[in-house]
Amino acid sequence: MPRKYFGTDGIRGTANTGHMTAETALRVGMAAGRVFRRGEHRHRVVIGKDTRLSGYMLEPALTAGFTSMGMDVFLFGPLPTPAVAMLTRSLRADLGVMISASHNSFEDNGIKLFGPDGFKLSDEVELAIEHHMDNGLADNLAGSRGLGRAKRIEDAQARYIEHVKHTFPKQQTLEGLRIVIDCANGAAYKVAPEVLWELGAEVVTVGTEPNGFNINEDCGSTAPERMCAAVLERRADIGIALDGDADRVIIADERGKVIDGDQIMGLVARHWKEMGTLSAPGIVATVMSNLGLERYLGSLGLDLVRTQVGDRYVVEHMREHGYNVGGEQSGHIVLKDFSTTGDGLIAALQVLAVLKAGDKPVSEICHLFDPLPQLLKNIRFKRGEPLKDKDVQEAIREGESRLGKTGRLVIRKSGTEPLIRVMGEGDDEKLVTSVVNDIAAVIEHNAA
């Protein structure tokens, strides 16, 4: 069934236009309240947000929707997405809500929903919410005495900080390490430096001065250049870059070289296998992960299981088949022993645990394999379905034929932005570049 509001990661769009308005947020709150208001107990929902200006608009609208359906609302303020997921379970809430557009610029915002178990909602539940958003909400309003209340939870950040610290080996500290942490002027701007400081590190901060407009602006995991420069300038041991809602992480070694999610997953898989804590003979990643990771894991006797793009699909497969390590090349790392969704800070602590356990620099620990040449191009379009065009389909078939068995193509429509993503990968870099550029040119021509 086609979706009207939800994409691959909740509802997302440009703030105060289209589906990302106060009116839509009100209806999301009412509809989700309708779906999750079950039984006779006092119902509650928790709401967190990142640092975007539009969060001030969406938070009260959602609160109004939920309270009108008789649900109490606990407000966290700026807090990472994985913290909202964790606190949904910890506070025995019926539903968790994160207001964020993740790695997007401040103009965008989004609404992510978590069930009482802390996991993102299934497609079926999201479709049920969509149905109620457009059908008869007024018939299910709470009575005058049954309205919900709203309360701000002052210690939400402290609760999450303690949770994250407990994922780090008790016998270790971060003393002696100089760490650059880039918080993308986002949701983790307070909690991430505090965690590292409390564990004993010397902390150098980047992107910790949000103003409502500068989230992800030339900083964070999608723009790690400032973090890398700070590592070199301050002679740090490691750099850590989170995105706007801190569910992604990218690492930099002491030379300022970037280490992506594939390398991080490989490191955690190897370490957990050695520790005997890997719950399955492999990990779960998406079709975007580099073939180099697959070959490296194979050398360890481990499998790489691929899903479609989106950390929710990675998590679904992990839950169904018993895996406890998974994620995406972009830095969504899901460690199911500790969290129900991607948690950039917890993933970074696992890298730091390996670093502290040995006497080698990050450059020797984290560069596990040489990735195959890979090129990703994003083509923006205004309307329609460019991938259904006959010329585009023919260009894709020709590209697949040219690559043959030496490479692969992944071409898909983004679930969060009006983009077509064209990714090519293979042993021959020149061939990969040529194939991707040719396909991108045809898409650009037909999407103009």
From Swiss-Prot:
Binding locations of Mg(2+): 102, 243, 245, 247
How is the protein altered post-translationally, as described in the entry?
Activated by phosphorylation.
EC assignment: the record states: 5.4.2.10
Enzyme class label = isomerase
**GO MF annotation: an example:** phosphomannomutase activity
Q: Which Gene3D superfamilies match?
A: Alpha-D-Glucose-1,6-Bisphosphate, subunit A, domain 3, Alpha-D-phosphohexomutase, C-terminal domain
Q: Does the keyword Isomerase apply?
A: yes
Query: Keywords, A to Z?
Result: Isomerase, Magnesium, Metal-binding, Phosphoprotein
Residues bearing Phosphoserine are 102
Q: Which cofactor does it need?
A: Mg(2+)
Q: Name one Pfam family in it.
A: PGM_PMM_I
Catalytic residues identified in the record: 102 (phosphoserine intermediate)
Q: What is one cellular component GO term in this UniProt entry?
A: cytosol
GO BP of this protein: carbohydrate metabolic process; peptidoglycan biosynthetic process; UDP-N-acetylglucosamine biosynthetic process
Which reaction(s) are listed as its catalytic activity?
alpha-D-glucosamine 1-phosphate = D-glucosamine 6-phosphate
Q: Does the keyword Manganese apply?
A: no
Q: Could you tell me what the cofactor note in this record states? A: Binds 1 Mg(2+) ion per subunit.
User: What NCBIfam families would the database entry show?
Assistant: glmM, PRK10887.1
UniProt family annotation = Belongs to the phosphohexose mutase family.
Function recorded in the entry: Catalyzes the conversion of glucosamine-6-phosphate to glucosamine-1-phosphate.
Recorded protein name is: Phosphoglucosamine mutase
Organism listed in the record: Parvibaculum lavamentivorans (strain DS-1 / DSM 13023 / NCIMB 13966)
At the highest ranks, the source species' classification is: Bacteria, Pseudomonadati, Pseudomonadota, Alphaproteobacteria, Hyphomicrobiales
